[in-house]
């Protein structure tokens, strides 16, 4: 059985993961509205991944006979300036999630909850990959640019990432 504090912290993380899913759905819709179908498809798929992260936490709480408390998820941002703005915000959000996961890991070590510490290692690895992915997309958009054919090329680049991740 997990401590009440650990249950509370993991429930808060579920909420953060669900917010991320909604944020990426909002960003996906913005991309589709702006004819950026590659980025729209990528972010739509990524929203599903974020939801899966929350479900993984829910499963862990269920397996440890702990109470899952789904909380209200705040409304995500819906207005973006550009494709670069969208992906800079995804990168910033992933950094926020990484910080949150690291805080959880530190708490588990401090309180000698080695089972939950071990469980969270998957998230540590996942966040490393997520930050690298989004940083790479931001860098590529900056390199290609968003003027003229650049926006189309950036969208195609992101589309190719989405297609390669399906395999």
UniProtKB/Swiss-Prot annotation:
The keyword tRNA-binding does not apply. It is found in: Cytoplasm. It is an enzyme of class 1 (oxidoreductase). Fe cation 1 binds at residues 17, 50, 53. It comes from the Bacteria. GO terms for cellular component: cytosol. It holds the Pfam family Ferritin. Residues 1-145 form the Ferritin-like diiron domain. GO terms for molecular function: ferric iron binding; ferrous iron binding; ferroxidase activity. Its main location: cytoplasm. It catalyses: 4 Fe(2+) + O2 + 6 H2O = 4 iron(III) oxide-hydroxide + 12 H(+). GO terms for biological process: intracellular iron ion homeostasis; iron ion transport. Fe cation 2 binds at residues 50, 94, 127. Its EC number is 1.16.3.2. Keywords: Cytoplasm, Iron, Iron storage, Metal-binding, Oxidoreductase. Homooligomer of 24 subunits that assemble into a spherical protein shell (12 +/- 1 nM diameter) that can sequester at least 2000 iron atoms. Iron-storage protein. Belongs to the ferritin family. Prokaryotic subfamily. This is Bacterial non-heme ferritin. It comes from Campylobacter jejuni subsp. jejuni serotype O:2 (strain ATCC 700819 / NCTC 11168).
């Amino acid at each position: 059985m997990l401590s009440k504090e650990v249950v509370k912290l993991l429930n808060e993380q579920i909420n953060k993961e669900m917010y991320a899913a909604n944020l990426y759905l909002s960003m996906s819709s913005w991309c589709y509205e702006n004819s950026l179908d590659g980025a729209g498809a990528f972010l739509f798929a990524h929203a599903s991944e974020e939801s899966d992260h929350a479900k993984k936490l829910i499963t862990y709480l269920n397996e440890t006979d702990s109470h899952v408390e789904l909380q209200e998820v705040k409304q995500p941002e819906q207005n973006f300036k550009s494709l670069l703005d969208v992906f800079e915000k995804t990168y910033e959000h992933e950094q926020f999630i990484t910080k949150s996961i690291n805080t959880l890991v530190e708490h588990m070590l401090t309180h000698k909850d080695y089972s939950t510490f071990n469980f969270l290692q998957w998230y540590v690895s996942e966040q490393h990959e997520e930050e690298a992915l989004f940083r790479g997309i931001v860098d590529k958009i900056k390199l290609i640019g968003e003027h003229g054919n650049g926006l189309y090329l950036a969208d195609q680049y992101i589309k190719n990432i989405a297609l390669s991740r399906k395999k």
